[in-house]
């Protein structure tokens, strides 16, 4: 039974003392605060409480002077109970002795400490453990504890508490221990390794806190009195805001604060915007070029880290990153003879130590300028993928492409000016060359020249390029030489993916702006299609785009058979939009697996302005199918043996079969309907209506040479309509007049003769041209007339019906 309900429960003093500990320290603070307030009350109030208290005490004493504590506050100390023998220490009349409180605190009572006090206590514990380990030469413990106090210092500086004195004492303590120990005396390999590690770390930390260490050496006792080390205010007198914006500003050394920010990057508890604000303040007080360079090399990636979890970097932050990269390049351009940043420099141990000068008097700093430009370009592309392409925001955002291209060119020229080793230069220029081609390969020649001119106009005069010279900018072949030169350099790289990408860029540009046959030969000789399925999705999408552009290039020259052959396999796919990278990013995110990262999904789609119009692709393929399949279909139905055409679900033959089954056939509405009506007119030999339907398709306006293409298309429709007419009516006529056919299809007589003779020879049709070349005489062949065909069909159906109505008697 619980003691609360037991009548004979004996109160145990020992349990009472343990139960008294249940009173939390927060309650004591609350009561002590109320005690200080009660002392300021009026005397009348005090007398009132004193009287009531004395009465209650008298009652208790008279009733049960020896009774144990009882009531709802039985577990409290006597001075806190309203009843039960002890007087309240908060009342003036109580005989409370302050020595009781001191004794209670000495008995191990918990005291509420601030986070700063707890951190200082942890540092003090480290100091004590290192002191003990120093006596036994336990360098493993010293190394671990010195590691711990370094992490505690980072926590203190993140909260802008400065550098505690105890930390300086520990550094001095470990430094003295290192100096007093000889490595030869350490026989254990693990201990010797820990000694070397500690020696390097304490050397670095001591140099970072050189001023504080000097003060400690001069006056060690002063560091026992103050809670934190007082660092001298720098000459610049700048202040750094706290991470929360509410703590008091502190003044610290430039590189000490910069090192703290570098150590804080990547931690989940760090406020990225606070780091950016701190770095921006550091830039306002930087004086030397080295300080500016190191601050920008830290600030730029910090801006990208701040938006790492977003779909794309906000435009205002993107422009800030762009400005920072531009300023960094400007500083590097101005100090190119003194400081250079590249990926092949040696790392430095201490950020405040400038690199040593090489034989040319240049201090080389480890860093990747183009990684910033590349990340900026990726964020730009992501923003285009997430903005509505049909809105004005997309066009406004697209204007920044020129700025990105300018940075790419500036970075390329900086590499050419700073890297002397040819091997290093080729490695460094690979990525800028790929990015330049990525921004221009799909554009027309005029647009590329405009971009190049604008980019070169902002380049300082002292920068020259041996790969893409500015001197040839006014020549007519500048763009061709640019694309070919960049592609040739990249095709010599060891990376096979880069080689294939460079070749595909060149083929696409050639097919779009130049000659189809040249682009086709480049594709066949390069063997770029070999194992293309084994490469990443972006390269496969580029290959599919090249194939489509090659087909469109053939169509512009009215090479119908070539165009149909190129596009047939690609358009047989039911996911044309996906294989061309033209689906929306949102749709990819819904269909992708959970393992696919955001970057992988972004590589599977292209911005809207790079898309190839799908309607144009469809109408080109349907038109090619119309000109090839309609004459062959007519010849086949006329009993002529023709070569089978590869099947395609988007062919005009399938559309006609579906159209003939419709119960209602309305006027044309879609582009497929217009091509379908053009096919029906061609079957009748009416080439004028066929051309009229084709010309009403609005997608032709996307072709740069629309009128030239339509004129060539008209001539081809006339020829194919002539073939269709000849196949349809040769079984009804014994001869065809060349003059009549020329008048009917608006073709020269020699053209009519040439077309029909080639058809007769190819398909082995029993017909020939007379000696005067005016009449085609058709011999009677094996084909049957329409009337005979109908009779055969009717006779077959009659036999089937007769057998069904009158089955044989012996049939089981």
From Swiss-Prot:
Main localization of the protein?
A: cytoplasm
Instruction: State the superkingdom.
Output: Eukaryota
Alphabetized, the UniProt keywords read: Cytoplasm, Initiation factor, Phosphoprotein, Protein biosynthesis
Family, per the entry?
Belongs to the eIF-3 subunit C family.
Q: Where is the PCI domain?
A: 608-783
Residue ranges annotated as compositionally biased, kind Acidic residues, are 18-30, 38-64
GO BP of this protein: formation of cytoplasmic translation initiation complex; translational initiation
Q: Mind telling me what this protein is named? A: Eukaryotic translation initiation factor 3 subunit C
Region: Disordered, residue numbers = 1-110
Q: Which gene encodes it?
A: NIP1
């Amino acid at each position: 039974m619980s003691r609360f309900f037991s009548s004979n429960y004996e109160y145990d003093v020992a349990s009472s003392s343990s139960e008294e500990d249940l009173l939390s320290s927060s309650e004591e603070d609350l009561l002590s605060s109320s005690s200080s307030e009660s002392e300021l009350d009026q005397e009348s109030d005090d007398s009132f409480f004193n009287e009531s208290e004395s009465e209650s005490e008298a009652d208790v004493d008279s009733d049960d002077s020896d009774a144990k504590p009882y009531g709802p506050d039985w577990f409290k100390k006597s001075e806190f109970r309203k009843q039960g023998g002890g007087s309240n220490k908060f009342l003036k009349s109580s005989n409370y002795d302050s020595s009781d409180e001191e004794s209670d605190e000495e008995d191990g009572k918990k005291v509420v400490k601030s986070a700063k006090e707890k951190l200082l206590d942890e540092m003090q514990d480290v100091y004590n453990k290192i002191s003990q380990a120093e006596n036994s030469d336990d360098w493993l413990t010293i190394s671990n504890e010195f590691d711990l106090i370094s992490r505690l210092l980072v926590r203190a500086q993140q909260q802008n508490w400065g550098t505690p004195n105890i930390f300086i004492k520990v550094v001095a303590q470990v430094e003295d221990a290192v100096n007093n120990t000889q490595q030869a005396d350490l026989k254990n390999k693990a201990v010797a390794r820990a000694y070397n590690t500690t020696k390097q770390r304490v050397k670095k930390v001591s140099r970072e806190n050189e001023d504080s260490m000097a003060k400690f050496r001069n006056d060690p006792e002063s560091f026992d009195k103050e809670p934190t080390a007082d660092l001298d205010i720098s000459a610049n007198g700048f202040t750094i805001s706290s991470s929360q914006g509410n703590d008091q500003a502190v003044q610290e050394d430039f590189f000490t604060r910069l090192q703290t920010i570098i150590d804080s990057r990547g931690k989940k508890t760090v406020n990225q915007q606070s780091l950016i604000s701190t770095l921006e303040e550091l830039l306002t007080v930087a004086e030397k070029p080295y300080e500016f360079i190191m601050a920008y090399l830290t600030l730029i990636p910090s801006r990208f880290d701040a938006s790492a979890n977003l779909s794309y970097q906000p435009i205002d932050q993107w422009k800030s990153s762009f400005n920072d990269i531009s300023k960094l390049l400007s500083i590097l351009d101005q100090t190119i003879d003194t400081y250079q940043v590249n990926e092949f420099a040696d790392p430095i141990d201490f950020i405040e130590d400038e690199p040593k000068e090489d034989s040319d008097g240049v201090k080389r700093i480890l860093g990747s300028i183009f990684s910033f430009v590349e990340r900026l370009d990726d964020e730009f592309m992501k923003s285009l993928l997430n903005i509505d392409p049909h809105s004005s925001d997309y066009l406004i955002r697209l204007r920044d492409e020129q700025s990105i291209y300018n940075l790419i060119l500036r970075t390329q020229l900086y590499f050419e000016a700073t890297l002397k080793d040819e091997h290093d230069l080729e490695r460094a220029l690979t990525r800028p060359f790929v990015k330049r081609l990525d921004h221009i390969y799909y554009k027309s020649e005029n647009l590329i020249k405009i971009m190049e001119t604008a980019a070169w106009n902002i380049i300082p005069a002292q920068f020259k390029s041996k790969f893409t010279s500015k001197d040839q900018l006014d020549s007519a072949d500048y763009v061709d030489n640019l694309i070919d030169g960049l592609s040739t350099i990249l095709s010599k790289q060891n990376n096979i993916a880069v080689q294939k990408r460079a070749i595909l860029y060149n083929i696409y540009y050639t097919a779009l702006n130049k000659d189809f046959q040249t682009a086709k030969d480049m594709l066949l000789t390069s063997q770029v299609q070999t194992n293309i399925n084994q490469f990443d999705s972006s390269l496969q999408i580029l290959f599919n785009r090249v194939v489509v552009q090659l087909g469109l290039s053939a169509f512009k020259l009215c090479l119908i058979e070539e165009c149909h052959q190129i596009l047939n396999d690609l358009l047989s796919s039911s996911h044309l939009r996906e294989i061309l990278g033209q689906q929306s990013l949102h749709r990819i995110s819904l269909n992708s697996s959970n393992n696919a990262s955001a970057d992988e999904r972004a590589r599977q789609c292209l911005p809207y302005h790079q898309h190839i119009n799908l309607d144009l692709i469809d109408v080109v393929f349907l038109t090619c199918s119309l000109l090839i399949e309609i004459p062959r279909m007519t010849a086949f139905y006329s009993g002529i043996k023709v070569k089978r055409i590869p099947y395609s679900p988007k062919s005009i033959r399938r559309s006609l079969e579906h159209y003939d089954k419709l119960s209602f056939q309305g006027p044309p509405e879609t582009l497929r309907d217009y091509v379908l009506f053009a096919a029906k007119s061609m079957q009748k030999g009416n080439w004028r209506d066929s051309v009229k339907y084709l010309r009403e398709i609005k997608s032709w306006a996307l072709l740069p040479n629309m009128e030239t293409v339509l004129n060539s298309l008209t001539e081809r429709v006339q020829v194919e309509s002539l073939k269709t007419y000849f196949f349809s009516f040769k079984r009804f006529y014994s001869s065809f007049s060349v003059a009549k056919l020329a008048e009917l299809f608006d073709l020269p007589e020699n053209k009519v003769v040439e077309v029909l003779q080639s058809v007769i020879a190819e398909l082995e049709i029993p017909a020939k041209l007379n000696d005067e070349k005016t009449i085609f005489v058709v011999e009677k062949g094996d084909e049957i007339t329409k009337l005979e065909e109908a009779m055969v069909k009717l006779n077959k159906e009659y036999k089937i019906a007769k057998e069904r109505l009158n089955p044989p008697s012996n049939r089981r």
